[in-house]
Every structure is written in structure tokens, then in C-alpha cells.
Design a protein with these regions (language model features):
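Alpha-helical transmembrane segments
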Residues: 296-304, 346-362
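A generic transmembrane alpha-helix motif of multi-pass inner-membrane proteins
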Residues: 340, 353-354, 361-417
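TM-loop-TM module centered on a large, flexible mid-protein loop between adjacent transmembrane helices
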Residues: 73-74, 80, 112, 216-279, ...
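Membrane-interface "cap" regions at the ends of multi-pass membrane proteins
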Residues: 1-30, 35-39, 51-52, 56, ...
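Membrane-interface loop-to-helix entry segments
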Residues: 110, 116-166, 174-177, 215-219, ...
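Helix-loop-helix junctions that connect adjacent transmembrane segments
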Residues: 1-3, 41, 45, 114, ...
Length: 417
């Protein structure tokens, strides 16, 4: 049964923005400043440019292949089944880790230490239930959460503007080339989410026109927001931001706006929920597409006849995220997620390069630069994250080899019978 096309341009933009404006914008500035130092603006520009290149490739592919699954489906069509499978696997496992990171960040802002893990798990369960009620409700809830998040970020920008004139922050340290790239990699985690729209190709109205516009609009808006937030943090806190657990609340406190600190905390929690909501939706759709193609158990390809959502896929994703929340920490989840996400977009750029001239909407150079950017940022990740990510990708390859062998044997047995 096909999915229902219900999402408008505004819905798609809200889902993309809700995916990007999540845990990253509230947590990434300390580590990014610690890595990039005085070159933070350069790191932000690098991350934004790589994200833009990836977005153009995703938009071009989505226009030619308006189906659920994102780069998994695009790579299957443009390169081959194996490449598509690796892309889908990287997306699913990487974004499941992102879901866990978003849930942990929500709980960190919303609950005292002893209650954070149970609350994070409860948030995952609740949002999976929202997804199972139907994609229209998912889009509406995401739009509400994005508005709340932007209000909190507006408070931070205003507080930073108020305090920057009187503040005397410690100067930022000089940066190394590796530090700038590491900072860009951290900031890229905060951008990831724009192509979430492309994974919902079977649910967007007029996808060939809507998806490219939605990706560009959402990314442009988020770049502007991040530039304003980064400026407020640097001008108010300076080098002290590197050691801050919650730099955005520190900016508001430095301005003397103590009464508004809870507003920022609520916004952080809302942003994390918004990103988690959109992530679960995107992962569920990719899992649905892979199961429909026989790459994963067929049970995951079933669509709820009433709600028109892949309920089994959503429930499985939610269960795995809860397990990670109960067993891992935030840093580990983010590091592993970055590895999977960058490989996913590397394959997206490679797929865009394989498209015929008639399907190109953007210069080939953007796809080349996007692929190179992904490779460079992967190389700048911590060694532990790279080793774990490589092991999980190889595990996925082994899983497909076993699945294909079992399928061939089953077919031979059926033929003999």
C-alpha cells in the first residue's frame, strides 16, 4: 500500500528545520570553540558549505526519484544495489544514534540527573506513538516545537547583543588546521537534517518541485540562525565557552537576564524533541523502503491501512533507540552518528555525479566538493568513532551477504520442490 501524500512545502520546511535546530545548536558551541578557537567562523563556513553541497545533491536526486528512502533509493537507482544498501545502513544506524543523542539532550535540560535516563526513554516512546498516529500530526507537532525553539534562540541572540558591549571575554586561542576541520565536523552534526525531507518523497505534495525548494529554504534559514547564535556566544563568553556545559544559558546569565534562563532551557528541550521527532520519521521511512526492497525483513514494509504510516518500522526504530539511551552516553552517540551521516552524504554526492545531464539541476562541481568535504570531515573525527563506525558498516555488509545467501538457498529449495 503506498504512503499518502499530505505534506506541503511549509510542512517539509518545518521538518527540515526541526531536524537541524536540535541538540547541536544548544550543545555544539563549547566543543567547536575548543577545537577551532579563533577560527570558529571559518569552521562554521566550512560546515555550512559542505551541508549546502550535500543539500544540492540531495535535492537533485529527490527531484528525479521522489520515493521514500532518500540516498538509499537514489544510490540503488544511480549506482547499484550494494551502494544503496550501504547508504541505507549508514543512515539507519547513524541516525538511530542521533535519536539517542537528541533524547539524552532533551532529558539533560528537562530533568535532574537521577531522572534523565528514564525521561529520555519515555520521550522516545511518546514520539514513536505520535509518528504512528500519522504524518500530518507529526508535521504539525514539529512546527510547534520549531517555533518554541526559535523563541528561545531569539532570547539568546538578544541577550548576547545586550551583553557584548560591556563584556570582556577571554580571547579565543589560535587554531590549527586540524582543529578547524574538527570544529567543522562538530558543527556539521548541528546541520545534519536538511535531507530528512528527501526521505519522505512519497508523502510530499508535488515532490519534484517541493523537495528541492524545501531543502534550500530550510538550510538557508538555519545557517542564518547559527551565525547569530555563534556570534552571541563568542562575543559574550569568548574562550570560556569551550568549557561551558550549556553555553547558551551562560550567555543569558552574562546579560543579567536570569529570569529568562528557564526559557532557554525549555527551548533546548523543545528543539531536541523536534529533531528527535523528525529523525524517527526519516529512519522509519528508510527502514520501510529497505524492507520493501527485500533488504530487511518484509514485516517492516507493512503500512498501517488507516494511518498510512510504516508502523512496524517505526516501532523497531524506537525500540533500538531506547536500548541505546539506556546503555550509552551522549558523546559516544554523537561520534558514531557523525561517522554514519558523513558516509551517507558521501554516497549521495557520488550518486548525484552519476546522474545524466538532463537530470542535473546544479553544477557537478558542487557534488565533487560535497564528496571531498565529507571525506575530509570523516578523517577529522576521533579515532574511536571512526573505528566503531567502520566495524558497524562491515557488520552491515556481512549481514547482507548472509541474507542474500539464505535467500538464494531458499529459492533453490523451492525450485527443487
Amino acid at each position: 500500500m503506498p504512503l499518502s501524500r499530505r505534506l506541503s512545502l511549509a510542512d517539509a520546511v518545518a521538518i527540515g528545520a526541526g531536524s537541524m535546530i536540535g541538540a547541536g545548536v544548544f550543545a555544539v558551541w563549547g566543543p567547536a570553540i575548543g577545537a577551532a578557537g579563533a577560527a570558529l567562523p571559518t569552521a562554521l563556513l566550512i560546515a555550512a558549505f559542505v551541508a549546502f553541497c550535500n543539500a544540492t545533491s540531495s535535492a537533485q536526486l529527490a527531484a528525479a526519484h521522489p520515493v521514500a528512502g532518500g540516498t538509499y533509493a537514489y544510490a540503488r537507482a544511480e549506482i547499484g544495489p550494494w551502494t544503496g544498501y550501504v547508504a541505507g545502513w549508514c543512515f539507519v544506524v547513524g541516525k538511530i544514534a542521533s535519536c539517542a543523542a537528541m533524547a539524552m539532550t532533551f532529558a539533560a535540560y528537562a530533568a535532574p540527573p537521577g531522572w534523565r535516563t528514564p525521561l529520555a526513554a519515555a520521550a522516545v516512546v511518546a514520539l514513536v506513538a505520535v509518528n504512528c498516529l500519522g504524518v500530518t500530526r507529526t508535521a504539525l507537532a514539529t512546527r510547534i516545537l520549531v517555533v518554541v525553539s526559535l523563541l528561545g534562540l531569539a532570547v539568546v541572540v538578544a541577550a548576547g547583543a545586550s551583553a557584548s558591549g560591556a563584556a570582556s571575554p577571554a580571547p579565543l586561542p589560535d587554531a590549527t588546521a586540524y582543529g578547524v576541520l574538527q570544529g567543522a565536523g562538530l558543527l556539521f552534526f548541528a546541520f545534519a537534517g536538511y535531507a530528512r525531507i528527501a526521505t519522505m518523497g512519497e508523502e510530499v505534495v508535488a515532490p519534484a518541485r517541493t523537495i528541492p525548494r524545501a531543502i534550500v529554504i530550510a538550510l538557508t534559514g538555519v545557517v542564518i540562525v547559527y551565525a547569530l547564535i555563534g556570534g552571541a556566544v563568542v562575543l559574550t563568553l569568548g574562550a570560556d565557552a569551550a568549557g561551558a556545559a550549556s553555553p547558551l544559558t551562560d550567555v543569558v546569565s552574562a546579560a543579567g537576564w536570569q529570569a529568562l534562563v528557564p526559557v532557554v532551557r525549555v527551548a533546548a528541550a523543545a528543539a531536541s524533541l523536534g529533531a528527535l521527532l523528525a529523525l524517527i520519521t526519516g529512519i522509519g521511512r528508510t527502514t520501510f523502503a529497505m524492507a520493501r526492497d527485500g533488504e530487511l525483513p518484509r514485516l517492516l514494509a507493512r503500512v498501517d491501512p488507516r494511518r498510512h504510516v510504516p508502523r512496524n518500522a517505526e516501532l523497531l526504530v524506537g525500540a533500538v533507540v531506547v536500548v541505546i539511551v539506556l546503555s550509552a552516553d551522549l558523546r559516544g552517540a554523537i561520534g558514531f552518528s557523525s561517522f554514519g551521516v558523513l558516509l551517507y552524504y558521501l554516497i549521495a554526492n557520488a550518486s548525484a555525479l552519476r546522474q545524466p545531464v538532463t537530470a542535473r539541476r546544479y553544477p557537478r562541481l558542487l557534488a565533487v566538493l560535497g564528496a571531498l568535504g565529507c571525506l575530509v570531515l570523516v578523517a577529522a573525527l576521533p579515532v574511536e568513532a571512526s573505528l566503531l563506525g567502520t566495524a558497524v558498516v562491515l557488520l552491515g555488509v556481512l549481514l547482507r551477504l548472509i541474507t542474500r545467501a539464505v535467500t538464494r538457498r531458499s529459492r533453490r529449495d523451492t525450485t527443487r520442490a
